[in-house]
């Protein structure tokens, strides 16, 4: 029990690192929450700090999710405080990753006012199901390129994830042959691509949550007032 608690606490602290706030303070001496949408996430960093900084912030937030779902769990597997949790591996990684997402949204380092958790959730899922997430990232990037709305891309990518897992698992069984190449590079633990049913359930919950956290963006999209990002600045 103590080991599970430690995993959740450390993952929360990792997720709580306020990347966009640090970038805003370092680059412009501002609190990014006072500008744009008022959110401390990657989307607002794109708007306020430019696409290069926004991309950097997003990548770091993604890494936070990967670290929580993979590295934190791996560390405590080899250095448990008491008995290592006897639960489904994917479920454990999801718990650690979600703790990081909660940390990102309710960061202890910034008055519990953080981002929306999209990038950190994406990082968590990259650590668990990298092949499926490559497809989801493709959906995200294509949508950003076409629409110039990161919010739209985030929503569509969230919806795409459980659909892709379900299609791969129950219709095509894509990616099963990857194990040979994974073992060849001796990286099966890190890059193991799961199609566990927990991911479908979790993906549906996350999709609903992301749609809910983007409700203000959806209102602005319907009103035609949602800001677009530009690839020609900064």
Swiss-Prot record:
Catalyzes the transfer of an acyl group from acyl-phosphate (acyl-PO(4)) to glycerol-3-phosphate (G3P) to form lysophosphatidic acid (LPA). This enzyme utilizes acyl-phosphate as fatty acyl donor, but not acyl-CoA or acyl-ACP. It comes from the Bacteria. Its EC number is 2.3.1.275. HAMAP family: PlsY. This is Glycerol-3-phosphate acyltransferase. The chain crosses the membrane at residues 4-24, 56-76, 90-110, 122-142, 152-172, 191-211. Its main location: membrane. The gene is plsY. GO terms for biological process: phospholipid biosynthetic process. It is a multi-pass membrane protein. Belongs to the PlsY family. It comes from Chlorobium chlorochromatii (strain CaD3). The lineage of its organism: Bacteria, Pseudomonadati, Chlorobiota, Chlorobiia, Chlorobiales.
């Amino acid at each position: 029990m103590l080991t599970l608690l430690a995993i959740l606490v450390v993952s929360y602290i990792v997720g709580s690192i306020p990347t966009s706030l640090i970038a805003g303070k370092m680059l412009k001496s501002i609190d990014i929450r006072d500008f744009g949408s008022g959110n401390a996430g990657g989307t607002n960093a794109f708007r306020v700090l430019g696409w290069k900084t926004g991309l950097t912030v997003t990548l770091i937030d993604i890494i936070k999710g990967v670290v929580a779902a993979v590295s934190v769990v791996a560390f405590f597997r080899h250095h448990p405080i008491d008995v290592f949790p006897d639960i489904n591996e994917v479920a454990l990684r999801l718990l650690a990753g979600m703790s990081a997402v909660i940390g990102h949204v309710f960061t202890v380092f910034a008055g519990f006012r953080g981002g929306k958790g999209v990038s950190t959730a994406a990082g968590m899922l990259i650590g668990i199901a990298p092949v499926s997430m490559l497809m989801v990232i493709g959906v995200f990037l294509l949508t950003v390129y076409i629409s110039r709305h990161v919010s739209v891309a985030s929503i569509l990518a969230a919806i795409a994830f459980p659909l892709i897992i379900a299609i791969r698992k129950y219709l095509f069984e894509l990616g099963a042959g990857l194990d040979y190449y994974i073992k060849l590079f001796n990286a099966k633990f890190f890059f193991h691509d799961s199609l566990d049913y927990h991911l479908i359930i979790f993906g549906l919950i996350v999709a609903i949550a992301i749609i809910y956290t983007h409700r203000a963006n959806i209102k602005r999209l319907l009103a035609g007032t949602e800001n677009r990002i530009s690839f020609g600045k900064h």
